[in-house]
Amino acid sequence: MATGHPSQETEADHAIGSALEIWEGYASDPEIRFQGSSGGVLSALALYCLERENMEFVLHTGADEAKPWANKTVQSRNRSELLARTGSRYAPASPCDGLGLIEKSSQPCVFIGKPCDTAAVTMLRQQRPELDHRLGLVLTFFCAGTPSTQGTLDLVKELDVPLQKVASVRYRGEGWPGRFKVRSRNGTKEKSFSYRESWGRLTGYRPWRCHLCPDGLGRVADISCGDAWERLDNGQAVGRSIVIVRTRRGQEILHKAMAAKYVELEPVGACAVLAAQPNQVERNREIWGRLLGMRLLLVPTPRFVGFSLFRAWRSLPVGRKARTVLGTVRRVVFRGLWRRRPII
């Protein structure tokens, strides 16, 4: 079960969920802004918490040094460690496996994860008082699904880099939106795809469960951030983020970080989120129909509370509603999604 808290003000407010404030901007540190995926705001906020709020570490996802095409949960304790781990990681990640480290910490910590991770953390902290006490700030980012590791491996193969010679895999960053880059161990070779090419391929490797997720904008966290894509379309050359403040704690930290010049932000409205992230909104309009298609075949479905999916579904044209339901039925049948499978 996932939960959301939609606003009742305007359709735009309803589409993005509960928000105390909405901003647009970037990290004040030019290196963090350049290295980050979309302006470096999450990294800048995490750094502020380490340097000014005396938080012990940031628990998040980084590349696995032994297998650079895979991810692992890491702790960053300073600017250099955060910088080395900036940028998106479009492969499976499970930062919740490090929550025990936060519980054992001597000071509050920052947690950064996907919307599904932060939703899990929010529910878990209600049952684990020490975890709740040590979570200084929970951050998430806009998410369109997590491709399988095979997606990355196939991209590396397309670039004709032998797996045993891969030194690093970078999905984004080093500019906006950045390129998918594979560096060889000898340090002399780097091959790459554009962001559009790489993400276009990786989307085909997302699991079905991601196609049913209504929480791409990260409703269950203190702060959620993502690309201000409309700025890129308008010729903006450096990264910019949409920043949605969800909680009083997030609001307090963000305002302090702005005052301390860690981030440069300007206020915007809910409509700016829709302009920056139209695909997130469009996807949510189809989810109720996908769930309906599964129920018609008696396939179990996840339960979502507070997202008002039927309200979003009603705004679709009749033809698109039919295509969504029928397309889901075809997927369930031809992909064997109706079969029970063991969890490995």
Regions found by a protein language model. Give the residues of each.
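Short cysteine clusters
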Residues: 1, 116, 210-213
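A short alpha->loop->secondary-structure connector
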Residues: 126-140
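N-terminal extension/subdomain marker
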Residues: 1-44, 48-54, 306-340
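Short, conserved secondary-structure transition motifs
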Residues: 142-154
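Gly/Ser/Thr-rich loops at beta-strand to alpha-helix junctions
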Residues: 38-41, 65, 111-121, 145-147
